[in-house]
């Protein structure tokens, strides 16, 4: 099934987890996150996308969720994400970018992304991309991981604010 999907779409299947909720909200029970992270670890054939407005909670909550199974911790008890976990932060303004992107970059993840919806003002993302330079990388070596993907959009409907 997964091979057929990849052959047709050229990518792995993705699960946009809790798209109408926030896994890292303080009201979400820790036990629920433990079960969720166990499921993520047991489904390496799927890419799991977690988008949050509370990126400041993510690193601590992920570590706590993984400590009980021991599935995702290194020998020195540091959180290590599964290869199929993507973490994203909602950013709508430069102030949010300045505050939250460093928190996103400090959260271990296979991939990191921004959801800039609705984009309510200009945001400078200079310096946050992977820098590919064939002369400075050995084959198979990746430069420092930064932001892998950006989703940009505006609002719709009556009274929608313009996108910048």
What are these regions (language model features)?
Residues 1-164:
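Conserved AdoMet/S-adenosylmethionine-binding subsite of the radical SAM
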């Amino acid at each position: 099934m997964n091979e057929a999907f990849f052959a047709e779409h050229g990518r792995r299947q993705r699960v946009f987890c809790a798209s109408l909720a926030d896994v890292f909200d303080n009201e979400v029970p820790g036990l629920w996150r433990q079960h969720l992270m166990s499921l993520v670890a047991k489904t390496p054939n799927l890419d799991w996308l977690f988008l949050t407005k509370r990126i400041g909670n993510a690193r601590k909550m992920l570590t706590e969720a993984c400590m009980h199974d021991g599935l995702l911790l290194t020998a020195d008890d540091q959180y290590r994400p599964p290869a199929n976990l993507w973490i994203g932060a909602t950013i709508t303004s430069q102030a949010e970018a300045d505050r939250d992107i460093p928190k996103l970059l400090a959260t271990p993840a296979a991939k990191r992304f921004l959801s800039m919806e609705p984009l309510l003002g200009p945001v400078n993302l200079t310096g946050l991309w992977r820098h590919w330079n064939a002369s400075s990388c050995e084959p198979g070596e990746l430069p420092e991981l930064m932001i892998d993907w950006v989703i940009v959009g505006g609002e719709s409907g009556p009274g929608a604010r313009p996108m910048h």
